[in-house]
Swiss-Prot record:
NAD(+) binds at residues 273-287. The gene is mnmG. This is tRNA uridine 5-carboxymethylaminomethyl modification enzyme MnmG. NAD-binding protein involved in the addition of a carboxymethylaminomethyl (cmnm) group at the wobble position (U34) of certain tRNAs, forming tRNA-cmnm(5)s(2)U34. The lineage of its organism: Bacteria, Pseudomonadati, Pseudomonadota, Gammaproteobacteria, Candidatus Palibaumannia. Its main location: cytoplasm. One of its GO terms (cellular component) is cytosol.
Length: 631
C-alpha cells in the first residue's frame, strides 16, 4: 500500500510521452507518480515496431541529448539499424531502427524502475480534481484520490477510443485495451476545444506463412548505427533483416471493389487520418495512377512469429483483409494473426496550450503526445520531455523552459502545435524546420546537452562523455589547423591523387577538408595527417563543421536576426483591433491565435510584413518595445 497519496507531479499514461515526462520530472527532483491502466504495456509500440526516420530520428536524438530514454531503449531493442538519406546532406540524414517489441518495453520499464523519485502504479484514471481553476489531483476508477500540484495527460488514443473493422465498431484504446470513456466525458465538461482524429494499423501476419525466399531482403547498415549519444554497438541485440514486397493490380481491384465496407468511405469514421501514413484504401484512391505500393515486412522481434506489413494499414472487414494480403507476392499463403483496424479518439486543440505545454485554461494541467493531435512515438516522446520539465519546474517555482525553432526540432514541433494548431495528425519532417542545416541529428547533443545539464536532466556519466567529445573536436580541429603541406612536401602525390587539382600552395588540414573530394577518413589516412580519431561521433562532427562552416555561419546570422523578433513580446490577451491600419483578416488571425511575440505573429497565415511593421510601431508608441523574453 502507498504511505500517502500526495505527489509533486502525476502523469496519466505510460506510453512514449508519459515515460519521458515521468523520467524528466523525477530527474529534476520532483516526487513523481506515473499512473497506467496496465504496467505490462508501459512503453508499448501500438503501431509499427520502429523508432526514427526522417524528422523523427532528429526528435529521438534531441530527446536523448536531454537525458531522455527513447534512444537508449531502441539501442537495447533494435534488430535492424539503418541511416536514411545517407547519400544526401547531413541535414536530412536520419537514423531508423526496427524494434523487438518485447525488448523495447523491457528496456523502458527497467529505466523507469531504476529512476529515483518515481513511482509507477497501475490505476485507471477517471477524472481530475480541480479547485479554483487549478488541477490538484486525479481520481481513479477505484475512487482513490491522488494529489499533486502538476498533472500531465499523456493518454494517447485512449480518450473515447473507438476501434473500427469493416462496418463494426467497439470501444477500445488499442486492440486488447479498454477505452477511457469516463475520463473523456469528464474532460469534455471543461472548456476545452475537443475534436476527433483517427489512425490505423495493418493486419499482423504469421511469419511461418510468408515465402521470404522470393522477396527482396533488406539488411542492417554496416557499420551499425547507434541511436544514443552515450550508447554503443555492443548494446544492440542480434540483427535480422526486413523484406520488401509490393501491392499489385489484383490487390487494388480487391480494395476498390470493397470500399463500401470501409468505415472511412461509408463515413462511419468522422476523425481525420494521418496524411503521411494513409490507409491502403486511401492510397489506391488518391494515387490511382500507381500500379503498386511498396510494403516493408518487418519482424516484430527476435523470438516473435509476427510480421508487421508496413504499408497496408486498413480497416476493411477481416475476410477482405485476408484477400488483400494473399494477393501480394510472397504472401499468397499468409495467415493473419491480428486484423488491421482504424481507431478514432479525442484530441484537444493544442492552441489552448502555452509553449510549456501547460493548459491556458486549467493551471497546472499539462498535455503531451497524441492528445495534442500528433502522430508518432518520437513526437510524443519530445512533448513528454517538455511537459515533464515544465510540470516539475512549476512545482519547484523555477523558470520554465522550452526550445525555440532555431534550437531544436522539438521547438519547431511545439511552436507549430501551439501557434497554428492542427487539422490532421501532425508528423515531423525536416522540411518543417527553416534552420534544418543547424538542426541536424549529429549535433543534437551540442545544441541541447549543456542546457539539459543545467536543468538537472543529465547525469555525471552522460556529462563526462559529452565533455570528452567536445574536447576531441576542439583538439582535432586545432591539430588539423596546425598541420601544413606544400607542393614540394615528400609524398604529396598521395594527396594530389585524391584531388581534382593538385595543390599549388601551402595548405593546412582544415582547408583541405573543405574540398568536396576529401573526407575526414581519407585525409587522416594520409601520412602527414595521421592518426584518425577513434571517436566516430567526434570525427563526423569535425567533418561536417568544417565542410559546411560557411553555410552554417550564414544560417546563424539569419537566426540572430529572427531571434530579435522572437524575443519581442506582445501583451497577453491583446485586442489587436487597437492597432491602427491592420486589415480585418490580420486582426481576426491575430486575435484568434494570440501570438506571444512578434516572431510568432510572423508565422501566422495572412500576416504580412506590413502588419508586422504596424505591430512594431504600436509597441513603440505604447512604450512596450523594450519587453523581451529572458530565456
Amino acid at each position: 500500500m502507498l504511505k500517502n497519496y500526495f505527489f509533486d507531479v502525476i502523469i496519466i499514461g505510460g506510453g512514449h510521452a508519459g515515460t519521458e515526462a515521468a523520467v524528466a520530472s523525477a530527474k529534476i527532483g520532483c516526487n513523481t507518480l506515473l499512473l497506467t491502466h496496465n504496467i505490462k504495456t508501459i512503453g508499448e509500440m501500438s503501431c509499427n515496431p520502429a523508432i526514427g526516420g526522417i524528422g523523427k530520428g532528429h526528435l529521438a536524438k534531441e530527446v536523448d541529448a536531454m537525458g531522455g530514454i527513447m534512444a537508449k531503449a531502441i539501442d537495447a531493442a533494435g534488430i535492424q539499424f539503418r541511416i536514411l538519406n545517407a547519400s544526401k546532406g547531413p541535414a536530412v540524414r536520419a537514423t531508423r531502427a526496427q524494434a523487438d517489441r518485447y525488448l523495447y518495453r523491457k528496456a523502458v520499464y527497467n529505466m523507469l524502475k531504476n529512476t529515483n523519485n518515481l513511482l509507477v502504479l497501475q490505476q485507471f484514471v477517471e477524472n481530475l480534481i480541480i479547485k479554483n481553476n487549478n488541477v490538484i489531483g486525479v481520481i481513479s476508477k477505484a475512487k482513490d484520490k491522488f494529489y499533486a500540484n502538476s498533472v500531465i495527460l499523456t493518454v494517447g488514443t485512449f480518450l473515447d477510443g473507438k476501434i473500427h473493422i469493416g462496418l463494426n465498431s467497439y470501444p477500445g484504446g488499442r486492440t486488447g485495451d479498454l477505452s477511457s470513456i469516463s475520463l473523456s466525458s469528464n474532460l469534455r465538461k471543461l472548456p476545452f476545444r475537443v475534436k476527433r482524429l483517427k489512425t490505423g494499423t495493418p493486419p499482423r501476419i504469421h511469419a511461418s506463412t510468408v515465402n521470404f525466399n522470393i522477396l527482396t531482403k533488406q539488411e542492417s547498415d554496416n557499420p551499425l548505427p547507434v541511436f544514443s549519444f552515450t550508447g554503443s554497438v555492443s548494446e544492440h541485440p542480434r540483427q535480422i533483416p526486413c523484406y520488401i514486397t509490393y501491392t499489385n493490380k489484383n490487390t487494388h481491384d480487391i480494395i476498390y471493389n470493397n470500399l463500401h465496407y470501409s468505415p472511412i468511405y461509408t463515413k462511419n469514421i468522422e476523425g481525420i487520418g494521418p496524411r503521411y501514413c494513409p490507409s491502403i484504401e486511401d492510397k489506391i484512391i488518391h494515387f490511382a495512377h500507381r500500379d503498386s505500393h511498396q510494403i516493408f515486412l518487418e519482424p516484430e522481434g527476435l523470438m516473435s512469429n509476427i510480421i508487421y506489413p508496413n504499408g497496408i494499414s486498413t480497416s476493411l472487414p477481416v475476410d477482405i483483409q485476408l484477400k488483400i494480403v494473399q494477393s501480394i507476392e510472397g504472401l499468397e499463403k499468409a495467415s493473419i494473426i491480428q486484423p488491421g483496424y482504424a481507431i478514432e479518439y479525442d484530441f484537444f486543440d493544442p492552441r489552448d496550450l502555452k509553449n510549456t505545454l501547460e493548459s491556458k485554461i486549467i493551471n497546472g494541467l499539462f498535455f503531451a503526445g497524441q492528445i495534442n493531435g500528433t502522430t508518432g512515438y518520437e513526437e510524443a516522446a519530445a512533448q513528454g520531455l517538455i511537459a515533464g520539465i515544465n510540470a516539475a519546474k512549476k512545482v519547484l517555482e523555477q523558470d520554465s523552459w522550452y526550445p525555440n525553432r532555431s534550437q531544436a526540432y522539438i521547438g519547431v514541433l511545439i511552436d507549430d502545435l501551439c501557434l497554428q494548431g492542427i487539422e490532421e495528425p501532425y508528423r515531423m519532417f525536416t522540411s518543417r524546420a527553416e534552420y534544418r542545416l543547424s538542426l541536424r541529428e549529429d549535433n543534437a547533443d551540442l545544441r541541447l546537452t549543456e542546457i539539459a545539464r543545467k536543468l538537472g536532466l543529465v547525469n555525471e556519466n552522460h556529462w563526462h562523455k559529452f565533455c570528452i567529445k567536445l574536447d576531441y573536436i576542439e583538439r582535432e580541429r586545432q591539430r588539423l589547423r596546425n598541420l601544413w603541406v606544400q607542393p614540394n612536401t615528400i609524398g604529396i602525390q598521395d594527396l594530389n591523387q585524391l584531388l581534382k587539382k593538385p595543390i599549388m600552395c601551402k595548405i593546412n588540414g582544415e582547408e583541405l577538408l573543405r574540398r568536396p573530394e576529401i573526407n575526414y577518413k581519407t585525409l587522416t589516412n594520409l601520412s602527414f595527417f595521421q592518426p584518425t580519431l577513434k571517436n566516430i561521433q567526434a570525427a563526423e562532427q569535425i567533418e561536417i563543421q568544417i565542410k559546411y562552416e560557411g553555410y552554417i555561419a550564414q544560417q546563424q546570422e539569419q537566426i540572430l536576426r529572427q531571434l530579435n523578433y522572437e524575443q519581442t513580446l506582445l501583451p497577453k490577451n491583446m485586442d489587436f483591433s487597437l492597432v491602427t491600419g491592420l486589415s480585418n483578416e490580420a486582426i481576426s488571425q491575430l486575435n484568434n491565435h494570440q501570438p506571444y511575440s512578434i516572431g510568432q505573429a510572423l508565422r501566422i497565415s495572412g500576416i504580412t510584413p506590413i502588419a508586422i511593421s504596424l505591430l512594431l510601431l504600436w509597441l513603440k508608441k505604447n512604450n512596450l518595445l523594450a519587453n523581451k523574453i529572458n530565456k
